[in-house]
């Protein structure tokens, strides 16, 4: 079974009824702001199978104690000392039980819903050695095959990506999230983003996949104004060419997914086929299936896009990394940038002063936000209750 497949029981399919349901769902979602859509998907993530979520709620709540928190965020002297003493490191997740725990924590601390990406997948904790607590999470996956501003920046060709296999030397960070209140008060998101380029990450990538990791890319949901701005590890490349598509609820998607798979088998096979030279299934395949459904029910994808383009960011770790990705030099000719040679030490020298200055400024201005962000109580909430409590937290 493929990652995008599901196995629900197959009810009787009424074409006109299901078409109406699908269009009504898309219209309902498109009437929301991007922030509201984001929260709605989060609410559904925990409430679409409420019985299961309720059974797991007590064990899920235990994850809260694993998260880093300042002892007393209003105690300026003590909090600054705690930041100075932080010793962040990356811990690679390498067994199924820990992978499940990582996913649960990811769903509890991040406003974006979680979808497992196709192909390669590396899940990472960013932890503090002193306390053992979690500072944030990272997931790295198979890079997207086409991304305009990135492709222009690198200057590579289709042959470079697939025939030469260079696309397997880059990755996209599908999750970069820090805990709160570390994020807002101490620029924790910037710290976790930097740690995605850690020497331990590069070492693991080489050991697991047999290829040198040249660069880490990522995107932001809300255009180019994001946590990635101003990080020396990442270059802001611009915005993605297209606006972000609104995705239907799983309940209506699954019904139509199985219908097109059965009744449009030839086109379905073509859309979901692997690309030669790329490790894993076609990236973006779920969106291709959604586009097939749009065509079938007679609606245009362009009518269901929100107003934000994605900001695109790229951590090129070698002075001549783009030349390697264009297949102009061999691996033994690569020259790593000094900041990535220095690794976590460089990151700490850059981040800690900025984190402390950010905290001091917020403290002086009375703008400290002490709240954590942990979505355990969204389980069992109505949609209206979830909006009232959490809508202002989206994008925090």
Model feature map: region roles:
Residues 1, 40-43, 65, 99, ...:
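Intrinsically disordered regions, especially transient/low-confidence alpha-helical propensity segments
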Residues 2-50, 55, 263-396:
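Long, compositionally biased intrinsically disordered regions
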Residues 5, 14, 27, 49, ...:
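Acidic-enriched, low-complexity/disordered segments with a strong bias for Aspartate over Glutamate
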Residues 6-24, 33, 95-99, 103-104, ...:
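Acyl-donor binding region in acyl/amide transferases
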Residues 22, 64-71, 75-97, 140, ...:
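Generic preference for hydrophobic/aromatic residues in regular secondary structure cores
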Residues 28-131:
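Low-complexity, highly charged intrinsically disordered N-terminal segments
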Residues 54-57, 62-64, 68-76, 173-175, ...:
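Long, compositionally biased intrinsically disordered regulatory segments in eukaryotic proteins
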């Amino acid at each position: 079974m493929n990652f995008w497949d599901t196995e629900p029981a197959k009810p009787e399919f009424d074409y006109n009824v299901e078409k109406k349901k699908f269009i009504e769902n898309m219209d309902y979602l498109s009437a929301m702001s991007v922030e509201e859509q984001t929260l709605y998907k989060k609410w559904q993530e925990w409430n679409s199978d409420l019985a299961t979520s309720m059974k797991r709620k007590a064990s899920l709540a235990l994850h809260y104690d694993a998260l880093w928190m300042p002892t007393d965020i209003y105690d300026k002297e003590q909090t600054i000392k705690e930041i100075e003493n932080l010793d962040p490191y990356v811990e690679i997740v390498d067994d199924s039980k820990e992978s499940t725990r990582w996913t649960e924590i990811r769903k509890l601390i991040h406003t974006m819903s979680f979808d497992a990406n196709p192909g390669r997948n590396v899940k990472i904790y960013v932890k503090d050695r002193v306390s053992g607590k979690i500072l944030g999470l990272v997931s790295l996956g198979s890079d997207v095959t086409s991304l305009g501003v990135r492709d222009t920046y690198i200057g590579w060709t289709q042959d470079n990506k697939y025939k030469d296999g260079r696309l397997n030397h880059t990755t996209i960070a599908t999750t970069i999230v820090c805990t709160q209140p570390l994020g807002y008060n101490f620029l924790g998101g910037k710290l976790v983003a930097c740690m995605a380029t850690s020497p331990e990450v590069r070492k693991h990538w080489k050991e697991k996949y047999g290829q040198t990791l040249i660069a880490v890319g990522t995107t932001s949901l809300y255009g180019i104004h994001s946590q990635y701005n101003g990080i020396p590890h990442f270059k802001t490349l611009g915005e993605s060419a297209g606006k972000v598509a609104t995705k239907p609820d799983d309940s209506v998607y699954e019904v139509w997914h199985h219908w097109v798979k059965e009744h449009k088998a030839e086109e379905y096979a073509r859309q979901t086929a692997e690309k030669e030279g790329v490790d894993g299934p076609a990236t973006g395949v779920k969106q291709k299936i959604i586009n097939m459904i749009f065509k079938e029910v007679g609606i245009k994808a362009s009518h269901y896009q929100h107003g934000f383009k994605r900001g695109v960011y790229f951590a090129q770790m070698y002075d001549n990394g783009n030349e390697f990705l264009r297949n102009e030099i061999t691996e033994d000719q690569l020259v790593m940038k000094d900041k990535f040679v220095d690794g976590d030490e460089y990151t700490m020298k850059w981040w800690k002063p900025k984190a402390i200055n950010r905290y001091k400024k917020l403290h002086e201005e009375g703008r400290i936000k002490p709240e954590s962000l942990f979505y355990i109580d969204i389980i069992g909430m109505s949609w209206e209750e979830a909006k009232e409590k959490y809508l202002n937290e989206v994008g925090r």
